[in-house]
Amino acid sequence: TLIGPKGLERVVNALRVIAPELPFPIIFKEITQNEQDFEVKGYHIHAFRVQHNVTCYGYTIQIPRAGRFHAEKAKELGIPLTFWSHLQKGETMTDGDKVYTPDMVMGEKRKEIKVTYVTDTRPLPIIAEQAKDADLFICEGMYGEPDKLAKAKEYKHMTFSEAASLAKEAQP
């Protein structure tokens, strides 16, 4: 699944001229709003518009995490080892008249993993808002030298120090 601005499918299909055969299908999801949410294979993806010379978005991806598997509890209950991975995936298993459910051996859900990714933009408040408490924040910084600030503003990019300031703001 590819998520991106309007015209994404046209651009990718033009590139497929050089790689027409792919071993997987491509599903396109075009962003039509300044902020938009998507659910893809259990992941929650929030796209948000950033400031660049062409339409560009940042993304926050939230990955849910199941609770920890309690192997000792599974052993105590006599659950066959071959069922363990199924129970960890949330599946109910039966063995004759015995029924084993995930809640018998799984702990509470753990904190989700949060990743925020932005590229090609000037600093914006929404970036720090989206990156707040992220486990990983990937942020562009096109110019390392402070004297390149005017160039960064002209071409709608960030300096390293601007990117670092956003990261600091996101992790109070």
Regions found by a protein language model. Give the residues of each.
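Short loop/edge segments at beta-strand edges and connector loops
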Residues: 30-32, 119
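Binuclear metal-ion centers of metallo-dependent hydrolases, dominated by the metallo-beta-lactamase
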Residues: 33-35, 123-172
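A short helix-to-beta-strand connector/capping loop
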Residues: 21-27, 40-41, 112-113
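Non-catalytic surface loops within mature trypsin-like serine protease
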Residues: 6, 32-33, 63-65
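Active-site-proximal loop/helix segment associated with metal-binding centers of metalloenzymes
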Residues: 43-117, 121-130, 136-141
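Short acidic-hydrophobic surface loop/beta-edge motif
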Residues: 35-40, 93
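Short secondary-structure boundary/capping segments
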Residues: 18, 35-37, 106-107, 128
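Active-site HxH/HxHxD metal-binding segment of metal-dependent hydrolases
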Residues: 1-30
